[in-house]
Amino acid sequence: MEYAIKEIARVIGAKTNQLLDDTVSLLLTDSRRLSFPEKSLFFALKTKTNDGHRYIQELYKLRVRNFVVSDMLPEFESMKDANFLIVKDTLRALQKLATHHRKQFNIPVIGITGSNGKTIVKEFLYQLLHNEFNIVRSPRSYNSQLGVPLSVWQMSEKNTLGIFEAGISQPDEMERLQPIIAPTIGIITNIGEAHQENFLSSNQKCMEKLTLFNDCEAIIYDGDDLFIANCIESACLSHKAIAWSRTDSEAPLFIESIDKKEFETIIHCTLLGFNRVVTIPFTDDASIENVIHCMAVMPVSYTHLTL
């Protein structure tokens, strides 16, 4: 999907040196990944160890002509046929553009968060659903402040379902990721010790993660995890909650028994009132839980996913 540079400048609130007519379809944050220079928009990101502005001259020589920068350096003045979109924060500009892109699509989107298992659950869901949906999903573990907008930018008119993961390491980060993913269905895998040092408490971290689901139609979680259940209630999200359970026979997905063999596990369950037997090639507790999270999406799919 292509965007005019003039539209992008408006969306990200950029000042400009000039606005030559041009369109782009690719976002670039790493100069080493350049493939189609004429259609690339380079974001000069600043990190603790690097500064993307250093690579603009090199990229210009390689025929890139569109840049988002926070500093207008003297050497850029000679690049008369290039567009420079000047913003205060280039990462924030990237996130704003990805949010705008997400708004162009009215398809179901599954958002996954939690301390562990996000990528595995995403890939398991892809295997379960890819025959029914044209799926766009996060590459690898692209779940950061940078990875999420790059993932969502992949959305196109051909897609009928999105599956994206979101990770945070400190407070207030999910507030930025939520409108980029804008999930219609949420999954929270678990709450562990990852990045705990940056939060005042596990409760604060869980509540921060649940921010992803503010506008969801359904939230899937382990109903036997009372800590997550209490956080969901505190966040006033209980009316959206769809819990799977090992103890509540009235749950949409009730796990009756888990029978571990040497090389496989047999799960006996009741799914929407129907008895099912599921055999999986895993025996470790983490993989079994990840599979059950994915199984819990199936009853949700009947009402919240549309072909």
Residue ranges and their predicted role:
Residues A9, R92-G223, F227-K240, P299:
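Phosphate-binding loop of NTP-binding sites
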Residues V11-I12, P74-S78, I187-L305:
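Acidic, Mg2+-coordinating active-site environments of NTP-dependent enzymes
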Residues L28-T29, A44, V69, I86-V87, ...:
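Structural signal for conserved beta-strand scaffold positions within catalytic alpha/beta enzyme cores
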Residues F43-K46, R137-P139, F164-E165, I280-P281, ...:
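Thr-Gly-centered strand-to-loop micro-motif
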Residues T47-N50, K88, S115, Y142, ...:
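Short, surface-exposed acidic/glycine-rich loop or hinge patches that mediate macromolecular interfaces
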Residues N50-H53, Q145-L146, P171, I288:
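Loop/helix-junction capping segments adjacent to catalytic residues or to phosphate/diphosphate-binding pockets
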